[in-house]
UniProtKB/Swiss-Prot annotation:
Family statement drawn from the similarity comment of this UniProt entry: Belongs to the HisA/HisF family.
Any one GO MF annotation of this record: 1-(5-phosphoribosyl)-5-[(5-phosphoribosylamino)methylideneamino]imidazole-4-carboxamide isomerase activity
GO biological process, one term: L-histidine biosynthetic process
GO CC list: cytoplasm
Domain of life of the source: Bacteria
InterPro entries per the UniProt record, alphabetical: Aldolase_TIM, His_biosynth, HisA_bact_arch, Isoase_HisA-like, Isoase_HisA-like_bact, RibuloseP-bd_barrel
Protein name per Swiss-Prot or TrEMBL: 1-(5-phosphoribosyl)-5-[(5-phosphoribosylamino)methylideneamino] imidazole-4-carboxamide isomerase
EC number per UniProt: 5.3.1.16
Amino acid sequence: MLIPALDLIDGKVVRLYQGDFAQKTEFDLTPLGQAQLYAQAGAEWLHLVDLDGAKDPDKRQQKLLAKLASDSGMKCQAGGGIRTTEDLEALFDAGIERAVIGSTAVNQPDTVKQWFQAYGGEKIVLALDVNIDQSGNAMVATHGWQQASTHTLDDILNRYLDLGCRHVLCTDISKDGTMTGTNVELYKRYKQLYPQVVWQASGGVSCLDDLKDLKAVNCDSVILGKSLLTGAFTMQEALACWQNA
């Protein structure tokens, strides 16, 4: 599946370069209008990142998320600063189908284990952002990549798989927002290690050949952000490529 993404600050569509708020590109389009274009092209899911909420949960763009959930024509998964059960329930109340949990899954495992038990694996996407170290280990970073952790991707996955964890969005930080190609080997390796996981690849997709390469290693889904917004290809072209790859 191909999942278009919108990153949101103050009601506007933006892109950050490698998670850096100082390296922000703002796009002259409305979130709802852009989402509806993706839906008309055939996309079924939309990935939303509330960057205001990520910085300060009190500034979550709740009304906008609810509007996108109700009017975009797609099912939505959303993340950005989900730290408490109240944060999580606010998203579900807004009509978001799946909550995307990142740093909290690394730093508050007991809380997130409770969420898997309460809501089930279909309602939660683990967002694990990794740096590949010199030994080839996928090391998880947290808090918008500002903090490195001592945990590998495997460490975090193994906490939650027995609790029904099914959806994992994995970003190679070195690729994000760069449009320099995707880390195909990373997704190939982890799909082979954890075939039961529905993997969402994110970061670096720059051309349709990148999609073919990911499909060839059985990656389940791909998040498309900058490549669509900058016109590298259209949603229609991407979907046709994915179906025929």
